[in-house]
Amino acid sequence: MISRHLQNNLMSVDPVSSQAMELSDVTLIEGVGNEVTVVAGVVVLILALVLAWLSTYVADSGSNPLLGTIVSAGDTSVLHLGHVDHLVAGQGTPEPTELPHPSEGNDEKAEEAGEGGGDPTGEPGAGGGVEPSLEHLLDIQGLPKRQAGPGNSSLEAPVRSEDSTCLPSSPSLISVRLKFFNDTEELAVARPEDTVGALKSKYFPGQESQMKLIYQGRLLQDPARTLRSLNITDNCVIHCHRSPPGSAVAGPSSSLAPSSTTEPPNLGVSVGSLMVPVFVVLLGVVWYFRINYRQFFTAPATVSLVGVTVFFSFLVFGMYGR
């Protein structure tokens, strides 16, 4: 009796247990247990975190030997450059260090000459071997001092040397810098008595009517004016402009002429001004076909035509209603 009762109880509980066993037997991946899948997922997650941390890791400059060598090389280059600048600066001002030596040598020679105890034939020979080099050194060092005045700076000396090479030796000639609008210059040599027309014909032959000379904001229109009367002195800058042949100014009388004679009429047609009339004509033609041949126009086409017309009307009123 007891065995039968237990068997009946097992039979009654069997459906639930069978469903639980079926659910427990279901795996995420067929052929692989759920435990293996969970462990593999955890390992992959840990690897992803480690890789993400390594990708954001930045090594210190002190721990990287390559970066340290680069920085050290850069420091040494800076030090070398500073040493070179110091040497150049030392070579640029040799007067305070070298000038006392010749003076001491001259004092010693004066003392030896005053004593007169040495060999008269040997001492001049020895002094003659050293004295020319010292005098040559003194001449080289004293030359810049004689050339540079007390009020001149170190930057004015190269400019004056360049001017001395460009300027002629004759005092009656002056040099004028002709500067164009494209930053090119030309050095012109003329006399103060030369006129503007002579300057144009000398340096711009055949282009006198096209060239415009501007000095201190003034247009040099009178070709009979001399350079002296215009206060054009040595090393002055005159700006030159080459105008097109059609709009060239011949002289002061041509500036008084009406603008229609100097400027050609604008015969070109502006395409932008014709856009609105052409678009109006196209809209009118489309509306004509819409009214007379309405069977060829569908409802979306009619709505689009109305929208384009309204938009164009607002655009035209916005442009010409100001």
From Swiss-Prot:
Gene3D superfamilies associated with the record: Phosphatidylinositol 3-kinase Catalytic Subunit, Chain A, domain 1
Superkingdom: Eukaryota
GO biological process, one term: ERAD pathway
Keyword presence, Cytoplasm: no
Pfam families: ubiquitin (PF00240)
InterPro entries assigned: TMUB1/2, Ubiquitin-like_dom, Ubiquitin-like_domsf
Keyword Transmembrane attached: yes
Any one GO CC term of the record: membrane
Start and end residues of each Ubiquitin-like domain: 174-247
Chain ranges passing through the membrane: 38-58, 267-287, 296-316
Regions of compositional bias (Gly residues) in chain numbering: 115-130
Membrane-topology descriptor: Multi-pass membrane protein
Subcellular location: Membrane
Chief location of this protein within or outside the cell: membrane
Annotated spans, Disordered: 88-168
Key words, A-Z: Membrane, Transmembrane, Transmembrane helix
PANTHER family, alphabetized: PROTEIN C7ORF21, TRANSMEMBRANE AND UBIQUITIN-LIKE DOMAIN-CONTAINING PROTEIN 2
Full protein name: Transmembrane and ubiquitin-like domain-containing protein 2
Gene designation: TMUB2
